[in-house]
Amino acid sequence: MAHVAKKYKAAAEKVDRAKRYKLDEAMSLVKQTATKKFDETVDASINLGVDPKHADQVVRGAVVLPHGMGKTVRLAVFAKGDKAKEAQEAGADIVGAEDLAEKIQGGFMDFDKLIATPDMMGVVGRLGKILGPRGLMPNPKVGTVTMDLARAVKEQKAGKVEFRVEKAGIVHVPFGKASFDPEKLKANFSAIMEVIYKAKPQTAKGVYVKNVTLSTTMGPGIKLDLAELAAQHA
């Protein structure tokens, strides 16, 4: 543990906690502060000026990252007939209907994402207690309840990430791996911020993006220059 603490301290010392970093510098720094032997995920913590207790201020969405997430996504799809065939041809790993529901009820969870056609939501809905806590319940707002399975499967395979504001008004969203080139991290992050800014609720008052911090899985937080972000997404 002393060795771990020493490595974290060394990484933290590279970051000026009082400074707000420009994007290019932040992306280089986030790579320098990744000290683990595994390829750490890079996350953004975005503090928004919204009150999620009000339904019209719940910010949520999804974005296909230009450079993906650096991992293979195992995808399950609830569909029947021609739609099941469409999902299989698009590259879905598991396709089923009532049979897949029974497997999930029996403990099968060998997938990362779940998509369903609207007509299958009656079956999927009965799995709410299993899927809900794991963040796997399909939702039309993020494109996981759809008739366009070919597109949905390809987007998920390409590295589509979903986000939803939490009770404290914070959005946590991953956007790559520490091994990524800084320019790829920057492109992925910028794609997320573009969607975040466009998702601003009309009823939100005052400053919308109040704080943005980047970090690797086990690394220190790096605060971003908000003026630069606002100018880029004006």
UniProtKB/Swiss-Prot annotation:
Alphabetical UniProt keywords: Repressor, Ribonucleoprotein, Ribosomal protein, RNA-binding, rRNA-binding, Translation regulation, tRNA-binding
Cellular component, GO annotation: cytosolic large ribosomal subunit
Keyword Ribosomal protein: yes
CDD domains attached to this UniProt entry: Ribosomal_L1
Origin: domain of life: Bacteria
Pfam entry (one): Ribosomal_L1
Xref: InterPro entries: Ribosom_uL1_bac-type (IPR005878), Ribosomal_uL1 (IPR002143), Ribosomal_uL1-like (IPR023674), Ribosomal_uL1/biogenesis (IPR028364), Ribosomal_uL1_3-a/b-sand (IPR016095), Ribosomal_uL1_CS (IPR023673)
Transmembrane intervals: none
Keyword Nucleotidyltransferase assigned: no
GO biological process, one term: regulation of translation
UniProt xrefs under PROSITE patterns: RIBOSOMAL_L1
GO molecular function: rRNA binding; structural constituent of ribosome; tRNA binding
Assembly with partners or alone: Part of the 50S ribosomal subunit.
Family stated for the protein in its record: Belongs to the universal ribosomal protein uL1 family.
Role noted for this protein: Binds directly to 23S rRNA. The L1 stalk is quite mobile in the ribosome, and is involved in E site tRNA release. Protein L1 is also a translational repressor protein, it controls the translation of the L11 operon by binding to its mRNA.
Name by which UniProt lists this protein: Large ribosomal subunit protein uL1
Species assigned in the record: Anaeromyxobacter dehalogenans (strain 2CP-C)
